[in-house]
Amino acid sequence: MEHKLFSSYVVKGVTLKNRIVMSPMCMYSSDQKDGKIRPFHISHYESRAAGQVGLIIVEATAVTPQGRISPYDLGIWSDDHISGLTETVERIHAHGAKAAIQLAHAGRKAELDGPIIAPSAISYDKMKTPDAMTEEQISETIEAFKLGALRAKKAGFDIIEIHGAHGYLINEFLSPLTNKRTDAYGGSLENRYRLLREIISEIQTVWDGPLFVRISAAEYAEGGNELSDFITLAKWMKKQGIDLIDCSSGAVVPAPIPVYPGYQVPLAEAIRHEANIATGAVGLITSGIQAEEILQNERADLIFVARELLRNPYWPREAALELGTTISGPSQYDRAWL
């Protein structure tokens, strides 16, 4: 039987050598607070590429300084960021992996000095209260995502992911729990989708490569979006040309989350089948057998691995051995891998 985890995957002309994706995870390591790539980032991402991950997604990268989660986040709001990102892409490509970047804005969850912005002036838990965005600020943010995509293209990335999850700005617009606007960007689901729809459209004016969106497909709170809402959103995104939905969950408001191995896989499965769009499964996927089951049963198209790759950069090899197969690695490691 073919091991689907190690089969190739083609998306809009980009071929991934396997179905293993390094999920975007903030490293908070831009220690000069300028959003620039540091040596740690390069070694961090290159080591996972050497470990034979098929697609590396660089962590949430802020499209504006105000859109950072912390002062130590990566940024893509300036052309000064391009050279470091270019080197990162080159080091990822050197090992046969493809490179993606997650474009992000933290919204009300930005832990920064000065004012922060969100769809409505509602704080997250005990954090700072944001300013409700003006229409001018909304337009500026949409433009910032477009310019971020253009810089990502110049840096050589193969894929872009838009961060629409975990209670950050786009998620805040999507959710009725955080979006209390009475203008064209609030109210109905269609209106709450307007920001993301316009961001997608603007990015597509400068980027014709694969485009993913990460969503929190469960909000775990009364009055929030339901899975049926996210299926509708996924259908709209497919019509716009989105290639894959990365299905995470939670964090739009403080709420208990029932966590167990593969707990978010049913979200990816439902959206894949109901919206007829490719999905990525993420969340406590820790073994090759578990990942293979998800793919063989057509519950998702790609496997996004997060903390397991922090623990073990060579997890793909471990997964292969568990499945009774072998994969190649850096020739320098042959005496250990063969």
Swiss-Prot record:
Coiled coil: none annotated. Keywords: Detoxification, Flavoprotein, FMN, NADP, Oxidoreductase. FMN binds at S23, P24, M25, C26, A60, Q102, R214, A306, R307. Substrate binds at Y28, H163, G164, A165, H166. Homotetramer. Belongs to the NADH:flavin oxidoreductase/NADH oxidase family. NamA subfamily. The gene is namA. Its EC number is 1.6.99.1. One of its GO terms (molecular function) is NADPH dehydrogenase activity. Pfam families: Oxidored_FMN (PF00724). SUPFAM superfamilies: FMN-linked oxidoreductases. This is NADPH dehydrogenase. It is an enzyme of class 1 (oxidoreductase). It catalyses: A + NADPH + H(+) = AH2 + NADP(+). Catalyzes the reduction of the double bond of an array of alpha,beta-unsaturated aldehydes and ketones. It also reduces the nitro group of nitroester and nitroaromatic compounds. It could have a role in detoxification processes. It comes from the Bacteria. InterPro entries: Aldolase_TIM (IPR013785), NADPH_DH_bac (IPR023663), OxRdtase_FMN_N (IPR001155), YqjM-like (IPR044152). GO terms for biological process: response to toxic substance. It comes from Halalkalibacterium halodurans (strain ATCC BAA-125 / DSM 18197 / FERM 7344 / JCM 9153 / C-125). Its cofactor is FMN.
